[in-house]
């Protein structure tokens, strides 16, 4: 109940802030052009703000400890491996971090190729062989080199804009329909209108999530291919095989799991940010 209340309160707060900002800027959201400007500003704005603070959020959320001076041979090997792969991929050395988790997982994040973070869990670092860890690191470095963070941010911005725009257009149509059948012609009223917008935001948001997940799965295949070039196909396959034998990933927040090595499994593959491990292994084997 608390989560639902917070979700509703957050949505209403965003709508209120959006309306105030648009009023200050003099944007008329009652016209299609004004509404599209409103949708684009908040659709892309939210996505790019998330990208800009992604490294900071990852460090705080996951409790990442950035390695500046290696404390042992394992950390030294980790830094040297990422440095070598980054050089091969033609990108600036990412920050390298470790976070405490029994799960075998890792992720890459950051606003650009030259300002990124690669983090691995203790479960992965100490639970896999060096060859397997090297395959995972190559996968994450490939995400950075491919510019996946920016690409998915642009896609997220587009679908956010669609959700905001479409929800309010449909709500406007419903309001006009109710108004035309109402003797007083008052329509839905402010609170009913906001409730309709909220529901439509949720429904269109589900569709948007499916679209983003589709592109995310494509980027995963590309990152696997990049890892095979950087570390060797056998190391990447070995890493995926090892992950397939382990438990399902569950602890990583969505904004990080999109660029993790091991995504959550779902009965509905359409909603998965990562292809099933079996399909990823098969794709590498047939390369």
UniProtKB/Swiss-Prot annotation:
InterPro entries: HtpX_protease, Pept_M48_protease_HtpX, Peptidase_M48. Belongs to the peptidase M48B family. It comes from Shewanella sp. (strain MR-4). GO terms for cellular component: plasma membrane. Binds 1 zinc ion per subunit. Its cofactor is Zn(2+). This is Protease HtpX. Its main location: membrane. Its EC number is 3.4.24.-. Disulfide bonds: none annotated. Gene3D superfamilies: Metalloproteases ('zincins'), catalytic domain. GO terms for molecular function: metalloendopeptidase activity; zinc ion binding. Keywords: Cell inner membrane, Cell membrane, Hydrolase, Membrane, Metal-binding, Metalloprotease, Protease, Transmembrane, Transmembrane helix, Zinc. The chain crosses the membrane at residues 4-24, 33-53, 154-174, 195-215. Zn(2+) binds at residues 139, 143, 220. The active site is at residue 140. The keyword Transmembrane applies. Pfam families: Peptidase_M48 (PF01435). One of its GO terms (biological process) is proteolysis.
């Amino acid at each position: 109940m608390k989560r639902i209340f917070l979700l509703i309160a957050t949505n209403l707060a965003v709508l209120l802030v959006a309306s105030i900002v648009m009023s200050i800027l003099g944007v008329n959201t009652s016209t299609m052009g004004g509404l599209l400007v409103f949708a684009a500003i908040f659709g892309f704005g939210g996505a790019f703000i998330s990208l800009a603070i992604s490294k900071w959020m990852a460090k705080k959320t996951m409790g990442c400890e950035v390695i500046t001076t290696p404390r042992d041979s394992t950390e030294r090997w980790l830094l040297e491996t990422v440095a070598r792969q980054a050089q091969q991929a033609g990108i600036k050395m990412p920050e390298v971090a470790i976070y405490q988790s029994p799960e075998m997982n890792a992720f890459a994040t950051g606003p650009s190729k030259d300002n990124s973070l690669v983090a691995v869990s203790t479960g992965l670092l100490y639970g896999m062989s060096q060859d397997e860890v090297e395959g995972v690191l190559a996968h994450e470095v490939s995400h950075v080199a491919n510019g996946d963070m920016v690409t998915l941010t642009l896609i997220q911005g587009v679908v956010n804009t669609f959700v905001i725009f479409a929800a309010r257009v449909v709500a406007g149509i419903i309001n006009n329909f109710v108004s035309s059948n109402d003797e007083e012609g008052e329509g839905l009223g402010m609170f009913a209108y906001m409730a309709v917008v909220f529901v439509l935001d949720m429904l269109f948001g589900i569709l948007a999530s499916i679209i983003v997940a589709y592109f995310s799965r494509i980027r995963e295949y590309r990152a696997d291919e990049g890892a095979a070039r950087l570390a060797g196909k056998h190391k990447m396959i070995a890493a995926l095989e090892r992950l397939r034998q382990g438990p399902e990933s569950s602890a990583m927040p969505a904004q990080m799991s999109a660029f993790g090595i091991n995504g959550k499994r779902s009965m509905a593959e359409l909603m998965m940010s990562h292809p099933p491990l079996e399909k990823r292994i098969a794709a590498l084997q047939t390369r």
